[in-house]
Amino acid sequence: MTPEEVVRAELEAWASLDADKIMAYIADHATFLPGFSFPTYSGFKEIRKAMEGFVKVMTKCDIEIVNLAVVGNVVLTERVDRLIFDGKPVDAPGMGAFEVSGDKITAWRDYFYSAADT
């Protein structure tokens, strides 16, 4: 898979709200910075625990890719993440930076607009 295909598959997996599918493209040694006030998670087990926590309080997750750019193994996404999170609808516009090695994401950093900016 190309880096773009890996990232697209990862983002599509979120619609399932299935932690196994979401984690299928995450490397054992990956780092994940989900934005907002969340900490950086490091390593497969720590990231999986975070993902399980996120999907536990979601009843919907649709991710619209507005723009996507690839430079080598880095994929940049402009997105709108549309969620029902803790019973509340949320449209979260933002950017993501993904570093990909082979068919795994080794680093994922998200940057979202604050509510005051949207």
Language model regions located:
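Hydrophobic alpha-helical core bundles mediating ligand binding, dimerization, or RNAP-core interactions
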Residues: 7, 14, 26, 51, ...
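Structured beta->alpha junctions
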Residues: 11, 36, 67-69
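Short, well-ordered alpha-helical segments enriched in acidic and aromatic residues
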Residues: 16-31
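Residues in well-ordered alpha-helical elements
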Residues: 4, 20, 44-45
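Short, aromatic-enriched amphipathic alpha-helices that serve as compact interaction elements
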Residues: 1-17
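A short gly/proline-enriched turn/hairpin at secondary-structure junctions
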Residues: 31-41, 55-56
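Short beta-edge strand/loop motif at the mouth of beta-sheet-based domains
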Residues: 39-49
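A beta-strand edge to alpha-helix "cap/lid" segment located at domain peripheries
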Residues: 2, 48-118
